Amino acid sequence: MPPALLALAISAFGIGTTEFVIMGLLPEVSADLDISIPVAGTLVSGYALGVVVGAPILALAATRVNRRRALVGLMLLFVAGNLLSAVAPTYAVLMSGRIVAALCHGAFFGIGSVLAADLVAVERRASAIALMFSGLTLANVLGVPFGTALGQHFGWRSTFWAVTVLGLMSLAGLLAFVPAEAVRARETVRSQLVPLRRLDVWLALATTVLGFGGLFASFTYVAPMMTDVAGFSAGAVTWLLVLFGAGLCAGNAIGGRFADRSPATTLVVLLLLLTAVLTVFRFTAAGPAGAAITLFLLGVIGFATVPGLQMRVIEEAGGSTTLAAAVNIAAFNLGNAIGAYLGGLVIDAGFGYAAPNLAGAALAAGGLALASVGAARRARSSPIRLAAADA
């Protein structure tokens, strides 16, 4: 394994921890800042929207910058945002810190995923991307559960202090392992914009928004769902997040392996399974055993889609991939925001903490429809692409 892939995974661990840990701390943040659970849930949406804004702007700004320097600069921004969150006395300041930290997210994963794909043979690109994203899955297995436990025992601000330190450790990993001569982005700003004129790229981006939105409509409210519906204690949430994170690890590895072989078909099958699991979760959430099992399956299937979703955009973008890859990270987080918002709406409407699962199933079904259309279009165009390659 190239050492640079390890550095990317370490950084992904830090970013993933700060993105997801807030979900396990919604009750603590809500009580401390005197806001409702749905309002606290907007801290998830705010982070996601920060990614959406920051991804294209910072990816374009990094066009002519050495990739190592770009990644280090983005990680410094991440540290600053988490430091602001750690000292935040109010909801508004906390939201500001979340947004600052989020600005680097899309560009980091966009540049990082393209670099990861460039470091290995063509037939291993999806697996290399999956390896980078394994940092996100490990964040859910280790960072999020223990960050949640830390926040429950010492206050939620202590979690953000810990994440700030984690960001500094990630920065050290980048400086140590990513070579100073890391390939410069070869695209001009103009060439990076070309893929965004293609219908298939936008179809892939929309699939990401809806598919991942389905996952986060449910997962955003996992803490109150597990305590108020399934009957778990607040302390059990930490171990439920470990269980979910274990599912993410398994799903990420499985998704990368199958996406290497047949990305389009794999994506369709996984989105079909995601729709089914979310639908079932609405009913299994009523009991502890069913809720725990379904939460694990949600992690497996939800994150198994990630390598295929990112690889599909890179393939459709052709030669100029950095901006398209970054925009797809923004699409993941736009899906997060939409999912969290819709989940909050159904809770506010009085349908209960299990109802967001059905909202998520509807979003995942939309992603399934778009993935099916995209797979059909790619199958029709494959002979043309092969002929062009042979010409």
Name the predicted role of every residue range:
Residues 316-353, 360:
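A late C-terminal transmembrane helix in Major Facilitator Superfamily
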Residues 6, 77-84, 92-101, 289-297:
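Paired small-residue
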Residues 53-92:
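Conserved MFS/SLC helix-loop-helix module at the cytosolic interface between two early adjacent transmembrane helices
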Residues 93, 121-177, 225:
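Helix-loop-helix hairpin linking two adjacent transmembrane segments in secondary transporters
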Residues 97-135:
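Cytoplasmic helix-loop-helix junction between adjacent transmembrane helices
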Residues 55-66, 251-263, 347-348:
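Helix-to-loop junctions at the C-terminal end of transmembrane segments
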Residues 265-309:
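C-terminal transmembrane helical hairpin of 12-TM major facilitator-type secondary transporters
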Residues 34, 66, 87-93, 231, ...:
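Helix-breaking motifs and short loop linkers at transmembrane-helix boundaries and internal kinks
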